[in-house]
């Protein structure tokens, strides 16, 4: 027993095996992303910046049912419904989300019967002032227009589980 221990320490077998292990990982491709310039894949269930969607004909989807406002645990959503139209439908006059209060739980998205409010793939929406985090209807519709292709793709991938 003493001879083998002395031989191992003299021949530095642990050092050599550790060196070759390090060299094996040194030449493998790096799993680290250079973040601002490279972005990794996002899950279809990712909950990012909110967006209001439109129908393909350009009409907004929100029917002013106020389910998202009722289900929001943070009370971050404020909706004012407009008067009924001649065809019996309603639309929102005011749709505000206080992103400072929002906890990104996704309950508003789950409650919406027409998939009008969604949490999109954008996670880079840092601001310099709090006021920029109060989203009105125009900002939400602009987000929906900007991210519609990715939102539709993610919703299609997630459809079997809804």
Swiss-Prot record:
It is found in: Cell inner membrane. Binds 2 [4Fe-4S] clusters per subunit. [4Fe-4S] cluster 1 binds at residues 62, 65, 68, 112. The keyword NAD applies. [4Fe-4S] cluster 2 binds at residues 72, 102, 105, 108. Keywords: 4Fe-4S, Cell inner membrane, Cell membrane, Iron, Iron-sulfur, Membrane, Metal-binding, NAD, Quinone, Repeat, Translocase, Ubiquinone. GO terms for molecular function: 4 iron, 4 sulfur cluster binding; iron ion binding; NADH:ubiquinone reductase (non-electrogenic) activity; quinone binding. It comes from the Bacteria. Its cofactor is [4Fe-4S] cluster. InterPro entries: 4Fe4S_Fe-S-bd (IPR017896), 4Fe4S_Fe_S_CS (IPR017900), NADH_quinone_OxRdtase_chainI (IPR010226). GO terms for biological process: aerobic respiration. It is a peripheral membrane protein. Its EC number is 7.1.1.-. Residues 52-82, 93-122 form the 4Fe-4S ferredoxin-type domain. One of its GO terms (cellular component) is plasma membrane. NDH-1 shuttles electrons from NADH, via FMN and iron-sulfur (Fe-S) centers, to quinones in the respiratory chain. The immediate electron acceptor for the enzyme in this species is believed to be ubiquinone. Couples the redox reaction to proton translocation (for every two electrons transferred, four hydrogen ions are translocated across the cytoplasmic membrane), and thus conserves the redox energy in a proton gradient. Belongs to the complex I 23 kDa subunit family. NDH-1 is composed of 14 different subunits. Subunits NuoA, H, J, K, L, M, N constitute the membrane sector of the complex. This is NADH-quinone oxidoreductase subunit I 2. It comes from Rhodopseudomonas palustris (strain BisA53). The lineage of its organism: Bacteria, Pseudomonadati, Pseudomonadota, Alphaproteobacteria, Hyphomicrobiales.
């Amino acid at each position: 027993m003493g001879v083998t221990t002395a031989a191992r320490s003299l021949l530095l077998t642990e050092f050599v095996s550790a060196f070759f292990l390090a060299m094996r990982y040194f030449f493998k491709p790096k799993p680290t992303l250079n973040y601002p310039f490279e972005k990794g894949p996002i899950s279809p269930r990712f909950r990012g910046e909110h967006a209001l969607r439109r129908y393909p004909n350009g009409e907004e989807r929100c029917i002013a049912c106020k389910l998202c406002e009722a289900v929001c645990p943070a009370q971050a959503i404020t909706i004012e419904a407009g008067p009924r139209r001649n065809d019996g439908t309603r639309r929102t006059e005011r749709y505000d989300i206080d992103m400072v209060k929002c906890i990104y739980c996704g309950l508003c998205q789950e409650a919406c019967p027409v998939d009008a409010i969604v949490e999109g793939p954008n996670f880079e929406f840092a601001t310099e002032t709090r006021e920029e985090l109060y989203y009105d209807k125009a900002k939400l519709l602009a987000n929906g227009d900007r991210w519609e292709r990715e939102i539709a793709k993610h919703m299609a991938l997630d459809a079997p589980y809804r």
